[in-house]
Amino acid sequence: MPLNDVAPAGGGAYPENGTKHKVSGMWKPDSSAGSNSGSGSAGLSLFSLQGQKWQQVFDMEKVIKQLRTAEKTYLRGGKNSSAGADQQAKVQVQRLQSADMAYYDLAPKLASRDIVLCSSCSGCYTKAGFQHHIALQHPSVWEATSSKVNPNPNGTAISSDSRLTATEISQEGGAIVPSSPTDTLSASTLSSCSNGSSSSASLQHPAAAGSSSTTSSSSSSRHKSSSSKSSSSSSSKGSSSTSAGSRSRSKSSKNRHHSSPAPALLESNHKESKGSKKSSAIAAPPVVAAVVKEEPPSVGAAPAAITMFSSSSNSSCSLPPTPTLGAASSEVAMGVNYSPAQLQTDAEKLPELQPKKKLKGSSDHRIKAEKEKNKDKSLVNSYEQQQVLSELDQAVSSITGAVSAEQVAPDEEELPLPNTSDENSISQTLDEMLDSKLINEILNNFDESALDTSQQQSQQQAQNGSLSHPAQATKRLRFEDGTIGEDYAVYQQQAVQQVYGEEEHQQELTTIDAMQLQQLIYQQQQMLEQQQLQEQQQQQQQDQKLQDHEQQRQFSVYNVPSLTDEAMVNPQQQQLEEHMILPSIIYEITESNPVSMLEQKVLAEFLTNAGYENVDVNVVQSGGIQTNLSSGTEANQLADELADFEFSKLETVSDTVKTVKLEAKAASQPPTTNPQINHHPSLANAKYHEDSYFNVMLYSGAPRPLAMNTFGMVKLPQGLGVTFRKNLLTTRKANNNLLSLSGGNHLGVVGQLARTPPPPSPALSNGLPGKNPASGRTIYAQRSNVIAQDRLRCNKRALVGGKAGGGSSGSPGVMTAKRLNELLMGKAKKEEKPPPDSEDGGEQPTKDKERDKEEDNKLTFSFYEKRRRLLAGKLEQLQPLGRPSFTLPLQSNHNASQSQSHSPQQLLKKQLLRTLSDSSSNMNISNMNNISNLNSSNTPSANSNPPWKGNSSNPGGNSTPTSSDLMRVFV
């Protein structure tokens, strides 16, 4: 039944989220999308308007507000709280046309079988909505396809369906969806929807593009030369694998390209079987043209290609096509992929049963999708370009090589690539692996010498494919090469697939946990050590043969071995590739999972060391190459340097007096003499120019989120971020911006933004800036060794109140932050309230003398001198047990007027304000008097420990440090 009729005739609109809406008036379910249902003035379905510009301009904010208020009233039970009268909440419902439901992410209850899963985000969409959704949510997927599919190489007919505009569609059979699930929603149509990312558009590579479309002779050779992975036989990709039973029939449509990502539903496949209706297609984005290639059934390679993927007669275990379009791997790997391969083969087997068969197939697709979803995690080929190049190279070699490709063609059968792209691929591809034909294949091709490391190296290189050890750089094999001739037919295909050394990893692009990663690195290193000696010996022999070193080297930057080289690969390069583990592997390591910190540590180590350990980038090859290479090696050195970057040596740019002196010196120099050295003078203390660039660009200013690109594409995994941040903090200079040392609340978000200084708050009654409750504690970092814990301890500990820790904050004996403020400013005189336990007899005069002496000291000694003096005599004075230590000694200044006069006092006041502005701990600063008297028992001595040093401090009375000392605490 058409999708529109799914609407319950009783007039209830589709319940969304399980809430039933009342319907005002009864819409009759519209039987064709064209008919005028009350859904808007003209009753156009949104679908028919597709692609038109929206004329009307909404004030989005207004709309959103309305929505919000509506939602609130609805959630509160629908009553308007303002008007308490009996306003019944009337819900007016506008019926959606079924064609439009997809746009709102709804799916009619009965239509659940018509849903397409978006593999990037696992959302459910009807097909119309799916196109819309892809265009909006995953545009990257969209572009990834359309730019790569090769539109219409030889002017072959563009499939008529792809161009249908919405109006034509509606003439063809109502709107697109109403024309009965049998055709629109048939399994075959869905095949283009199968993965949200790329469906199975087989790439046409430039080498083959010209020849492939119509002529049978050239296409057979095309199957040989192209690598089976990317485009070999589009039969394995195009209409997905068809079982051997239906081979003759489906052959004509086998090499059809799906174009565009899922949304364009192009079905030229079932025209003959369907007869009555062409399946309708959504108008695809105009860029993409579907290429329908009808290959004559006589092509030699086609049958082989089919049997390759459905080798057993049982169609249900044929491998799904492996789409090769590159989209971001993260987007593809997540969701459930629904691949219609099975359904299609079922349907094609029994033409006469087809309508029924298809209905059944589409209704039960969820079960099948479950089966398929694991097999079909689409393999993302992130090295597409490499493949294109190698294929081009292949083509060239077939022209220039001593032997042309035709000689190989007859006896070669393509090896199936097991699809290892899933986590537990072994269990899933078991049926395929156990398939007898495949086993025979393997047994025939397996060569034990591959496992024997003592074998000649050249032998191993030839057997790239079966080597346990993946990362050898590919080389093109020559047919005349006596040693390797026998293996050639078997391994040629693999040699192409291995173009990028890590091809095999790339098929298992799933996340690697730390242990595996370590193992992998370890294995690779082992392999290297075993094989290095052999490689070196061979290298010496082959070096004599090599004249065109430079050309080969130049090519190998792009990893295309040059046309004329002997069958040999530069060992240097092999080692490099040995160690490069695909960025995409690293990309996928779970990024915000607190449990995985251990993995992160391993990873961080790997990032810094593994890549660089065994690779000697700077080995001198020979004089000739050196010139060409200089630029390349420089780049390598630079990369190395950045990786081993020593943060401890970082100097942040500062404008202190020191720098000013430097500036003067630089200015006095005649500017022209040494342009190298004459950078901006303030950078003079940076180690290298690169370093200074790092300082200025990355590390100065408010620390913005930082990601260092280790390989050029890698987001930092957590562990690294944390260490970077730690290093930055310790190297930051005092004059740089604030940093909160509160550390990883956010599990190592890199460069978490420090709190900016608190915004000016409303002034207190006395005209001073008040506390800002929001602002946190900040610390001005000096040098890494100075930000030692004692500083932190000092700032973190609460300032404890009088005898009992402070009564109500209002009571005169308790020093609140505000009160301290007033005292410092001289706004309020301090009340001398001798507390009960004091013996204040001779205490006060001593106190004053003490202060005077300190004033003298302040004038005579330099800061460091005083510090030395304070630290010299360590007099361990235990505090009375009950007394918590008072860690912020303040100068008890009885003549307030004097305190106002000298500036250090002002400065101290500012510093204190900064510290005290933290409202989280309610600090009570006890009355100075109190404090000095509590400690009267201890003999005052100028040498006693400065109070901020540890627990041996004696609060207050003895050496009340002057303001300059206090500043040390805060600066």
UniProtKB/Swiss-Prot annotation:
Keyword set, alphabetical order: Chromosome, Nucleus, Transcription, Transcription regulation
Please give the GO cellular component terms listed in this UniProt entry.
nucleus; polytene chromosome; SAGA complex; SAGA-type complex
Task: Report if keyword Transcription regulation is assigned.
Answer: yes
Subcellular location per UniProt equals: Nucleus; Chromosome
Q: Which domain of life is it from?
A: Eukaryota
Q: Does the keyword Transcription apply?
A: yes
**Any one of the GO BP annotations:** SAGA complex assembly
What happens without the gene?
Answer: RNAi-mediated knockdown results in lesions throughout neural and retinal tissues due to tissue degradation. RNAi-mediated knockdown in the retina and the lamina results in degeneration of these tissues and a rough eye phenotype.
Something else the entry says is: Shares sequence similarity with the 3 sequence blocks that define the Ataxin-7 signature in other species, however the order of the 2nd and 3rd blocks is reversed in drosophila.
- Which protein family is it in? Belongs to the ataxin-7 family.
Oligomeric state and interaction partners are given as: Component of the Spt-Ada-Gcn5 acetyltransferase (SAGA) complex consisting of wda/Taf5L, Saf6, Taf9, Taf10b, Taf12, Ada1, Spt3, Spt7, Spt20, Sf3b3, Sf3b5, Nipped-A/Tra1, a histone acetyltransferase (HAT) module made up of Gcn5, Ada2b (Isoform B), Ada3 and Sgf29, and a deubiquitinase (DUB) module made up of not/nonstop, Sgf11 and e(y)2 tethered to SAGA by Atxn7. Untethered DUB module (DUBm) composed of not/nonstop, Sgf11 and e(y)2 remains enzymatically active.
- Indicate what this protein is called per its UniProt record: Ataxin-7
* Originating organism: Drosophila melanogaster (Fruit fly)
Instruction: Tell me the organism's taxonomic lineage.
Output: Eukaryota, Metazoa, Ecdysozoa, Arthropoda, Hexapoda
The UniProt gene name for this protein comes to Atxn7
